[in-house]
C-alpha cells in the first residue's frame, strides 16, 4: 500500500506529461447492403479448403466504365469443387456464380447490371487489370483465371465483349493466371500486357491435406502449397498496330525469371528513368522487379535494388502491393503484404532504383498474426501524407479451432502516417467497417461517392463484398487528377504525378493493377491539408513528356491532357 502511495503521484505526473493522442478523423462504415452490393463471392469450401485453388481468392475494381465521372464497381467471383471430388462443381442453370458488375447510380447506390454488361463466365477468377488498350476512350478489362484468361473490350456505355481470341490472347492450354498489368513498355502509345502465372497445378494429381511436408501448418493438416508445387513462367504480350497481341515472353526476358510463385503485378517507373518497370509480389519466394532496359527487354533487378526480400534478407509470402510516396520526397515507395507470423515490407525509395525496407522502424511491425492481402497507401485523412490500409483473412478455415490467435476472419488494418517516417496503428479508431471480421482478399480504393475522400471496395470470401465509405470528419482540402494521354496511352497508365503543396511533395502513379489482384480508380487522389491549392503538379508521362501546372485550385477533379498544360519540359 505504501509502495502504491509512493508510485501514484509519479504515474499521474507521467500521464499528465504524456502527449495527447491525436484525433483520427477517419471512420469507415460498411454500406454495401444499402448501396446494392449484395451478391456473394463464392470461393471454395466454407469450413475447409482441400486444395490451394480454393484459398487465394480474387480481386475487385473501382473504375468508370461508362465515362460519366462516377466510379463503377466490379467484384470477381470464384466457384466450388464437388464434394469429395476433384472437379469444379456443375451448378444448376442460373445459379452459377459469376463476377458482378455494379453501375454507380450517382446517389450513393449501385445497380447490378452484370448480365447486361456481358459478364457470364464461371470459374476461379483471380485478378483484374484495367486499361484502354484500343485507345478509344472506354476502359477495357483483363481478368485472369485458373484455366483461361479473358480480355473484355468496352463497347461503350459499360457494355463488354469477350475479344480474347480475336485479340490473339487465347491460351493454348489451361494455366493459373495470377497478377496482370496493361503496360506500354516500348513507348509506342499502345498498351501491351503482362500476365503472371502463379504455379502449375494439376487438380487430378494434387495431394490431400496433411499428405506431404508442405501440407501442414503448425502441425495441423491443411491444403498443400505453394512450396513443393511446380512453378510456371510469366508472359508478356506486345500489342501490334492492328490491336492484336504477340507473345514476346522469351524475347523480352520476362519468361527467363523462374522459380517464383508470382501474385500481384504493378507497372510503374520505379527508377525514375522515364520507362515503365514491373514489380511482382511473389508468394514464399523472392519478389521480381523487371527493370525496363529501353530496348524491348527486361532484367530482374529485385535483389540489387533491395526489394526481393525483407530487411533481414528472407523471402516472404508476397501477396498485395501498394505504391505511393509515404515520406514526401517525390519518389515512389512500395508496400508489400505477407502471411501470418510476418509483417508488411515498406520499401523506401533511395532514388535511382534503390530501396530499403523500413517497415520495423516505421512502426508497421506491431501486428503479425493476420494473413495480409489487399493493400494500399491512400491519404485517408487528406493531410498530404500516404497512410497504410490492408485487408486480412486466413487461408486455412480449420486453423482457428487449434490456434485462436490466427482468426480465419480478420479486420482491416489501418496505420496513420504521423510525420512521413512513423506510422501509428489506428485500426481500433477507424470505425465499424474496419473492425468487422471477414476473410478478405482484394481491395480497390477510390472516391465512389465523389465527396473528396478515399473509400474502399473489399472482396470477401463466400460473402458479399464490403463497401467501406470513408466518413471523413476533418476539413482538409483535396485534389483528384485524371490523366488523358495523347502521345501516351489514352488512360495515362505508367505515368507518375508529383504534387507540391506548401513545400511538401507527394508522388503517385497511374496503375493498371495494385492492392491484391485489384484496380484502383484511375483518378489520383491527393490530400492538400489546410491548403486551398497545389502549388505545382508535375506529370511524367510514359512517352517521356513532362507537363507542369502551377497553382491548381483544390476540392475538385482536374483532367490533365498530355501536352496541354501550357508548361512542358
Model features per residue range: what roles?
Residues 56-67, 103, 124-139, 153, ...:
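Beta-propeller blade termini
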Residues 113-133, 138, 144-185, 195-227, ...:
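Asp-box/WD-like beta-propeller blade repeats and closely related beta-sheet repeat scaffolds
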Residues 70-77, 136-145, 193-197, 273, ...:
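Hydrophobic beta-strand segments that make up the repeating blades of beta-propeller
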Residues 76-94, 197-229, 390-407:
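Short, conserved, GDST-rich strand-edge loop motifs in beta-rich repeat architectures
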Residues 28-30, 109-119, 159-170, 243-255, ...:
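Blade-edge beta-strand/turn elements of extracellular beta-propeller
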Residues 37-59, 95, 117-129, 169-181, ...:
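Repeat-based blade/solenoid architectures
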Residues 19-27, 35, 45, 362, ...:
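Gly/Ser/Thr/Pro-enriched helix-cap/hinge segments flanking short amphipathic alpha-helices
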Residues 97-104, 233-240, 291, 348, ...:
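Beta-propeller blade signature
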